[in-house]
Amino acid sequence: MGCSASKDTTNSKDGAASKGGKDGKTTADRKVAWERIRCAIPRDKDAESKSRRIELFKRFDTNGTGKLSFREVLDGCYSILKLDEFTTHLPDIVQRAFDKAKDLGNKVKGVGEEDLVEFLEFRLMLCYIYDIFELTVMFDTMDKDGSLLLELQEFKEALPKWKEWGVDITDATTVFNEIDTNGSGVVTFDEFSCWAVTKKLQVCGDPDGEGAAKTTADRKVAWERIRCAIPRDKDAESKSRRIELFKQFDTNGTGKLGFREVLDGCYSILKLDEFTTHLPDIVQRAFDKAKDLGNKVKGVGEEDLVEFLEFRLMLCYIYDIFELTVMFDTMDKDGSLLLELQEFKEALKKWKEWGVDITDATTVFNEIDTNGSGVVTFDEFSCWAVTKKLQVCGDPDGEENGANEGN
């Protein structure tokens, strides 16, 4: 897309119109294809979407390495998702999304040049693909002659559409010149997409912004149920419930729980997956913390099991991590599992509810961002949150000697 290209507006618009569009597709064809694509890309955070995403990743991963190259992603977008039904620019779209997800993954992991996307970045990449597709819809709506360059007149003719997209433009020429950053007199897709993202033109590749009220209400109901379901207290009734729960978890009858038994119990008995799609990660963190503390107390080295003495502590850790997840997800609007400074600032009112009055958000954000990557991971957030005691009271007695269940 050269910025110096010129347009023959006399003939090219008529030619595009006679074909029904720049790639031979009519508007109706493209709408049908777009609706199918919206359903085909599993971007949501619910359990069903995650299950579809796991299966899709396996199908994309033709080499079986657990990491996807650009070629594997592009082939999958053609042969499995069939995204080429919508656009002739699929390689460009996939390349943009692949690079953004890969670069962010490398930045967080501290890796330099790894040219692969792992499962942790896969959802983010799908969100980017969706975003770029949706921006393509907007751009194509205005780009009547299919030259991949917008002229001022085309921009002005699309003003009624801008209101639908969430922007009320009063001075089209000024805005057009703002978008045309290199002053060429035409707007490229790159220039348009950079500007559109800053204006948040209802481009919500991560659908958590859509219907967020319903999601929040559902999560509140689930969270209240989970608060009651995890018997963390030291009173007689809670201990009795804990003994019964341990027996239900202990399907092998050994008096010790492996990680698989704990995870299965959290799914089938406590039903903690109603609240989050990250249950395996949460349980793994809690299991490891309780197990390691138990081994330290007992003087055992590597036993990979949790006994009843550590069971209450493990439940407390699960509760802690769930509550931290609530906090993190409240701020992480785009679902990338990374917090940006702007997201952190937008949550300042919430911080007061969580027990911290922040006056200098940038300084605190940089304090949390211990590796200086410019984004905050959940690990960084949770480590900092625990030091601030953000009303995260997994162990309701404030004690970490929960390995002693004899109390």
UniProtKB/Swiss-Prot annotation:
UniProt: Ca(2+) 2 binding residues: 143, 145, 147, 154
Positions annotated to bind Ca(2+) 1: 61, 63, 65, 67, 72
GO cellular component, one term: motile cilium
Residues reported in the UniProt entry to bind Ca(2+) 6: 369, 371, 373, 380
Region Disordered, residue ranges: 1-27
Location relative to the cell: Cell projection, Cilium, Flagellum
Membrane spanning stretches: none
Positions annotated to bind Ca(2+) 4: 250, 252, 254, 256, 261
Keyword annotations from UniProtKB, A to Z: Calcium, Cell projection, Cilium, Flagellum, Metal-binding, Repeat
Region of interest (2 X 186 AA almost perfect repeats), ranges: 25-399
Entry binding sites for Ca(2+) 3: 180, 182, 184, 191
Protein's job: May contribute to the rapid motility of the trypanosomes, playing a role either in flagellar structure or in calcium metabolism. Could alternate between a GDP-bound inactive form to a calcium/GTP-bound active form.
The family this protein is said to belong to: Belongs to the calflagin family.
Domain notes for this protein: This protein has 8 EF-hand domains, 6 of which may be functional calcium-binding sites.
Annotated protein name in UniProt: Flagellar calcium-binding protein TB-44A
Origin species: Trypanosoma brucei brucei
Organism lineage string: Eukaryota, Discoba, Euglenozoa, Kinetoplastea, Metakinetoplastina
